[in-house]
């Protein structure tokens, strides 16, 4: 499939008719920022396509169904935003920042609900629990993994790592946390015992992104060794937990924390790349399905829409592309 372009669109002055996307070449539309480099993008919140852009200390919401409405801006962080994640129901947004804090935002009102302090250095990653209590995990340059009960301002649990933590996520039951860092290892922490349960070794460089599969059985990792891997995190899995390795994308001297993601049906995985392409692989064959060009800088994040066959990619070139993949 050819990846071609509509004319570049600045700001929010355009329309997207999802009924017509099947007849369009990709991407269907693009955003061009006028400020600092984008860090994060995500698409969630019920059945709408919600585009959320981040630059230094700020988030802007755009609804890109029909008339493109800029319907909110969140301000509060005093340094770069490094990561974000929505709650399962889409009502709360959790953000991590180089200002050493994690913030919780009400996505309906656009107000800050909580400011979580506990890290002593940059916070690199944040993730909320998929089910169970309202827990959030964050990791930072202070070599800690912090577990937060969002009803309180101080961390409920501190897990001490040896090196800086660059990626975190919960397992499906929210009884374990998976972390990755500059020591190349992925660690699974037992929250009932507040200790390390086991390690998963295989990457030869910093782990930059983690994503739990839709069924909760596997975790996807992206690393600076230029591999994306799938790991079996089910109880009583074989000792060799790395079950798939995907190659083709690249990391470079910029050492950006490139993230990764699953498609809603678990049949595809995606990752950003420093070679200016967005990569999508088939999880069964491990073949590259799409190598999508167009960006003029490292692609930091590639996200799947939760309902439609649509992806969004975000890059250091201050652009976000939205397009159909099938």
Q: Regions from the language model: what does each represent?
A:
Residues 11-12, 17-27, 61-81, 87-91, ...:
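Per-blade loop-tip surfaces of WD-repeat and WD-like beta-propellers in eukaryotic adaptors/scaffolds
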Residues 1-15:
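Long, intrinsically disordered, low-complexity acidic/Ser/Thr/Pro-rich regions
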Residues 251-280:
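Loop/turn-rich, solvent-exposed surfaces of beta-rich toroidal or solenoidal domains
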Residues 303-326:
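Blade-level signature of beta-propeller repeat domains, shared across WD40, Kelch, NHL, RCC1
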Residues 53-56, 95-99, 138-142, 173, ...:
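Conserved strand-to-loop turn within each blade of WD40 beta-propeller repeats
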Residues 31-56:
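Beta-strand-rich domains and repeat architectures in extracellular enzymes and scaffolds
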Residues 41-47, 85-90, 96, 127-133, ...:
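Loop/turn segments within WD40 beta-propeller blades
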């Amino acid at each position: 499939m050819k990846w071609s372009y509509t004319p570049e669109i600045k700001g929010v002055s355009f329309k997207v008719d999802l009924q017509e996307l099947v007849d369009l070449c990709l991407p269907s539309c693009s955003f061009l920022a006028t400020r600092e480099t984008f860090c994060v993008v995500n698409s969630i919140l019920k059945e709408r396509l919600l585009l959320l852009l981040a630059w230094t200390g700020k988030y802007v919401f755009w609804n890109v169904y029909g008339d493109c409405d800029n319907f909110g801006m969140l301000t509060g962080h005093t340094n770069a935003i490094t990561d974000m994640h929505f709650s399962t129901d889409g009502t709360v947004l959790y953000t991590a920042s180089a200002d050493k804090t994690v913030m919780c935002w009400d996505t309906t009102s656009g107000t800050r609900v909580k400011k979580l302090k506990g890290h002593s250095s940059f916070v690199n990653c944040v993730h909320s629990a998929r089910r169970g209590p309202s827990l959030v995990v964050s990791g930072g340059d202070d070599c800690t993994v912090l577990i937060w009960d969002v009803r309180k301002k101080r961390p409920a649990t501190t897990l001490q790592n040896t090196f800086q933590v660059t990626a975190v996520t919960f397992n499906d039951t929210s009884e374990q946390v998976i972390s990755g860092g500059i020591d190349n290892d992925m660690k699974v922490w037992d929250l009932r015992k507040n200790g390390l349960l086991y390690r998963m070794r295989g990457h030869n460089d910093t782990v930059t992104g983690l994503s739990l599969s839709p069924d909760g059985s596997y975790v996807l990792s992206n690393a600076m060794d230029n591999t994306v891997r799938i790991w079996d995190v089910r109880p009583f899995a074989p000792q060799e937990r790395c079950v798939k390795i995907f190659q083709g994308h690249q990391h470079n001297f910029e050492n950006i924390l490139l993230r990764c993601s699953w498609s809603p049906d678990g049949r595809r995985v995606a990752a950003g790349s420093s070679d200016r392409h967005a990569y999508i692989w088939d999880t069964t064959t491990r073949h590259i399905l799409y190598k999508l060009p167009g960006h003029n800088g490292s692609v930091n994040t590639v996200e799947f829409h939760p309902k439609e066959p649509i992806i969004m990619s975000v890059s250091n070139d201050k652009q976000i592309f939205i397009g159909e993949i099938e």
